[in-house]
């Protein structure tokens, strides 16, 4: 994973996703890493030929919406998060990274079948869509436990200081 996406894993905004809860006590960051690992495992176990680097990068960025979806407001009612966050994640990821068509497909289509008209077109998107559903279920029912959110300020150096403090 590190070889495929060092720019993502070390970016300030990706590190900020440790400060937002996704499901249960799982952060968005942990969830995206889980989905990435499971996506690779699915492709390996089922011998699905795919572009692994794009699979990993798309999985890491599939929930790159960069806000706490549990807090609703007039523009982001929390009960509609599932419908609109793929577009927000794609916009955010596109503004920071040069995405391939496969990576865009993964990010934009990962909520299918909820987003009925956004059918995945490549096998990488189908794999991530499947892995995302499985991870979401296991995280929601607390079969997989997270560590809760981390207070994160805006820089990589600040994040490393927080992690060092927590380890001690």
Q: What are the language-model segments listed below?
A:
Residues 1-168:
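Metal-dependent phosphohydrolase cores
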């Amino acid at each position: 994973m590190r070889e495929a996406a060092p720019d993502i894993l070390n970016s300030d905004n990706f590190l900020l996703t440790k400060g937002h809860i996704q499901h249960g006590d799982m952060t968005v960051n942990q969830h995206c890493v889980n989905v990435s690992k499971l996506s690779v495992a699915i492709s390996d176990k089922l011998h699905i030929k795919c572009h692994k680097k794009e699979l990993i990068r798309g999985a890491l960025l599939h929930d790159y919406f960069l806000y706490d979806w549990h807090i609703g407001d007039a523009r982001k009612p929390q009960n509609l998060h599932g419908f609109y966050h793929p577009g927000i994640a794609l916009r955010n990821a596109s503004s920071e990274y040069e995405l391939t068509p496969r990576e865009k497909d993964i990010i934009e289509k990962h909520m299918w079948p909820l987003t009925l008209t956004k059918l995945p077109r490549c096998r990488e998107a189908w794999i991530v869509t499947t892995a995302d559903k499985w991870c979401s279920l296991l995280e929601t029912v607390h079969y997989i436990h997270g560590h809760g959110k981390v207070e994160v300020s805006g820089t990589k150096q600040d994040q490393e200081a927080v992690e060092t403090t927590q380890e001690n």
